[in-house]
Amino acid sequence: QQPVSRQPQQIIPQQPQQPFPLQPQQPQPFPQQPIPQQPQPYPQQPQSFPQQPFPSQQPFPQQPPFWQQQPVLSQQQPCTQDQTPLLQEQQDQMLVQVQIPFVHPSILQQLNPCKVFLQQQCSPLAMSQRIARSQMLQQSSCHVLQQQCCQQLPQIPEQLRHEAVRAIVYSIVLQEQSLQLVQGVSQPQQQSQQQQVGQCSFQQPQPQQGQQQQVPQSVFLQPHQIAQLEATTSIALRTLPTMCSVNVPLYRIVPLAIDTRVGV
C-alpha cells in the first residue's frame, strides 16, 4: 500500500479585518445660555397721605351735680317706669309682706314710755335684740320709765292692749332696721281719676268725716327678720304684763303674713 501523499494545505492568510473607523461622537453640547435674571424692582413710590389735622376736641360739658339732676316730686315730673320693676327684682327676693297692727296714733303716743323702756339696755327685750349702746342707762332712769309705762298701759282698753304692744314692738324693729313702710291707699272712685299715670307723686285723698277708713300698714321682710320680729314680740308680751301686773291677751287679731312675693 502506497502511502497517500498528503498535499500540504494552503493556509489562506486571514486578512485582518479593518475595523470601521469609529467616528468619534463629538458631543454637541447645547449651549446653555444663562437666563439673565434682571430684577425689575418695582419702584416703591412712597404714597404720602396728606395729614389732615384732627378737629380740635371740644371739652365735655360739665354736668350739674347729682342732687340737681333729681326730679322734684312737687313739680309733678314723670318718672321712668322701667326702673320700678328692676328695683323690685333686686330688692324683693324671698320677701314676705307683713301687716303691721294699726292702732290710733294717740295710743302710740300714750305708750311712748313703754317703747323707750323697751329700747333701753335695762329691758330684756333690748338685750335680745343686742342693741349697741355706748353707755347703759342709770337704774333711776329705767325705774322712771317703768313707772310711766305701767301708769299708761292699764288705761288702754283690754281688747286693744295686744295690738298696742305689737305696734310699739314693730315700730322699734323697723326703726332699727331702717325699713320703709308701704302704706296702702284706698281711694274713692270719684277721686281716683285725678291721678296721673306715670307720675311720681299723687295727692292722697283725705277721707271724709263720716268715712274714716283705717288702712293697716304693711312692710316686706325676709324670713329671718320675721322670725326675729316674732321672738321680740313674744318677749314684749310677757315682759310688760308681768312688770305692770296688767292683763294683756296673747291672741292675735290680724294674721302676720298676708302675701308672699318671690323675686325672679
From Swiss-Prot:
The keyword Repressor does not apply. The keyword Kinase does not apply. Residues 1-66 are annotated as: Disordered. InterPro entries: Bifun_inhib/LTP/seed_sf, Bifunc_inhib/LTP/seed_store, Glia_glutenin. Gene3D superfamilies: Plant lipid-transfer and hydrophobic proteins (1.10.110.10). Keywords: Seed storage protein, Storage protein. It holds the Pfam family Gliadin. SUPFAM superfamilies: Bifunctional inhibitor/lipid-transfer protein/seed storage 2S albumin. One of its GO terms (molecular function) is nutrient reservoir activity. Residues 16-44, 52-64 have a biased composition (Pro residues). Residues 1-15 have a biased composition (Low complexity). Developing endosperm. Belongs to the gliadin/glutenin family. Sulfur-rich seed storage protein. This is B3-hordein.
